[in-house]
Amino acid sequence: MDRRRFIKGSMAMAAVCGTSGIASLFSQAAFAADSDIADGQTQRFDFSILQSMAHDLAQTAWRGAPRPLPDTLATMTPQAYNSIQYDAEKSLWHNVENRQLDAQFFHMGMGFRRRVRMFSVDPATHLAREIHFRPELFKYNDAGVDTKQLEGQSDLGFAGFRVFKAPELARRDVVSFLGASYFRAVDDTYQYGLSARGLAIDTYTDSKEEFPDFTAFWFDTVKPGATTFTVYALLDSASITGAYKFTIHCEKSQVIMDVENHLYARKDIKQLGISPMTSMFSCGTNERRMCDTIHPQIHDSDRLSMWRGNGEWICRPLNNPQKLQFNAYTDNNPKGFGLLQLDRDFSHYQDIMGWYNKRPSLWVEPRNKWGKGTIGLMEIPTTGETLDNIVCFWQPEKAVKAGDEFAFQYRLYWSAQPPVHCPLARVMATRTGMGGFPEGWAPGEHYPEKWARRFAVDFVGGDLKAAAPKGIEPVITLSSGEAKQIEILYIEPIDGYRIQFDWYPTSDSTDPVDMRMYLRCQGDAISETWLYQYFPPAPDKRQYVDDRVMS
């Protein structure tokens, strides 16, 4: 699968996509910022100019694959690439008084073949100068790079950038843009996790997926003492161009990004993904198939959370299915959605390399009216933690035609917890396992005679305690099969309630079973809605095998 090869490369931060055709547009611009490393011609720049660039670029043909890299860069191993360090003494804002933020650039090489141009902007005068590549900006250490091949390659460009925050101004970055239109940020743990993208195209269609590139960035010079910076980006691909403005707030416990984009379609697009995010789910409390390791859980995110336009909150636990699955959840002007990592307990992961208990959640908050569309969720089978296998995005209902223009505004929260949560009872965890026996007899002296699958969903918060004396009723809807042995159990350690039921098949079908449940008290909903997709085994696997040897 092309997507899998791309994502595997991105684990080494590699992205192989098409080149930009903006050189003539830059040369036609009239473009200075006070920066020791900016050495290009002075040019005028603001967001309206960038929008015009993107609009005009969409009227021209996409130039296709990137040009070849010098051999010394093209053949690098991930280990060699990672040993290249940017010289912190030549950072973008090194000379800013009382700087709280600083920026460094990533070197081209390995899978990073797309030239990305960098510009420094004086926000007061709207003048910019390009920062050209030169080997003296980097420390090559033991990377084995033949720097003679790089002499005179001022147009080589960079692969991306990252931003550091005081007091870790040259040691631990908090924001990173690297590869295609991928970018990431951290919370106060400094632990990277899932990624966002500028745009997704044809993620789940009969066409080959397209990965647009950010091909140029313009940085407003950061103000003394500021923890907020603004960077502009030009996006380019075979089907679309875009002008992006990122206002990024590097707060104490989270990073917040205000994003504004203006998109210009070159071609008809079957599936346009707005504010896409990419994560990894190998196994968790609900999905144990790939957990034959010392780690109880392995995932960057454990659920998709949605706050629908009608006010309903939905929790959709993630899966690692045996077959690729794509689900689309319709909505009208969504209030927010995101891939969340809410389980922060180290003992639930036992991982001192990945530190999954520290990985951030990502929440999207639309800032203008997005209209009708769907939240798409793609879950790809994976054998482990080295491949991102979860994709989520907003797809507008209206088909995209060549020449169409769009504008979206949204806010991204990179934090341990989303900025908002359901005021009703919330899903804490989902567990699945063998069914068909009374709780407390697991499974008893012998296996159950009839096969079933048990589901246990824990709810916490809201007004559960007040509702309990009046009666809590789980409302369960299944696309196939039957729910039996339904129990409501109070769980003192979490001060919440567990809804437990066994699913029994009513046919031999192995089609996914869509499950939906919420809690009701005297006719009123008192919880968010739990959605789940279960994949029944083949009929000949619906039996328990007693493999004990008693003699």
From Swiss-Prot:
InterPro entries noted in UniProt: Gal_mutarotase_sf_dom, GH-type_carb-bd, Glucan_biosyn_MdoD, Glucan_biosyn_MdoG/MdoD, Glucan_biosyn_MdoG_C, Ig-like_fold, Ig_E-set, TAT_signal
UniProt pathway annotation: Glycan metabolism; osmoregulated periplasmic glucan (OPG) biosynthesis
Keyword Calcium (UniProt): no
GO MF entries: carbohydrate binding; catalytic activity
Disulphide bridges, residue numbers: none
Role noted for this protein: Probably involved in the control of the structural glucose backbone of osmoregulated periplasmic glucans (OPGs).
Family in the record: Belongs to the OpgD/OpgG family.
Name the UniProt record assigns to this protein: Glucans biosynthesis protein D
Lineage: Bacteria, Pseudomonadati, Pseudomonadota, Gammaproteobacteria, Enterobacterales
